[in-house]
């Protein structure tokens, strides 16, 4: 399926404009795009944007994603800026400068988009990265992720423990200076036990 750049770009503007997904960084955006295409594929039989996804350590990345972001910024539809979240941590934040054109999407596509926002919109980038790692398309892919593998999900008994560790990590990022002695060391031990790997959102792709 050929990528529909117009839909891809307007979907990016839509996510950047929607209050339910703010703040929006590049890692979170790329995972929302992936889950939108995968959800529509499972429901209807084909993705919305037709984008090809590459397998990166922190989840799927649309091959045309960076190009779309550059074009949107060039035409002043979005703004990308480096935002300081703590004394030492920064995040690349994406903000919409104009309203998206949603008339190009079908009613079924809009239902899919809103369902993705409802299900994933409040998740952080690290949580979405972990969730994308449970997808068969990510587990069995080498360099690029064929969405044909997407209808199946992979889950293990470790999933709940992983989710708890991610939630704790997100709590620490939210209030890094207000933790009791030993909290961070204990959290790192738990993450290591669960064999998870994280990265600061300030070092996004």
Question: What annotation goes with each model-predicted range?
Answer:
Residues 18, 119-123, 174-175, 193, ...:
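A structural signal for alpha-helix termini and helix-coil/disorder junctions
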Residues 1-156:
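Domain-edge interaction signal
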Residues 7, 24, 64, 105, ...:
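Generic detector of ordered secondary-structure context
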Residues 197-204:
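Short, charged, intrinsically disordered terminal tails
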Residues 44-45, 162, 199:
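Glycine-centered secondary-structure boundary/capping sites
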Residues 155-194:
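Short interaction-prone segments
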Residues 36-43, 177, 192-196:
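Short alpha-helix boundary/capping elements
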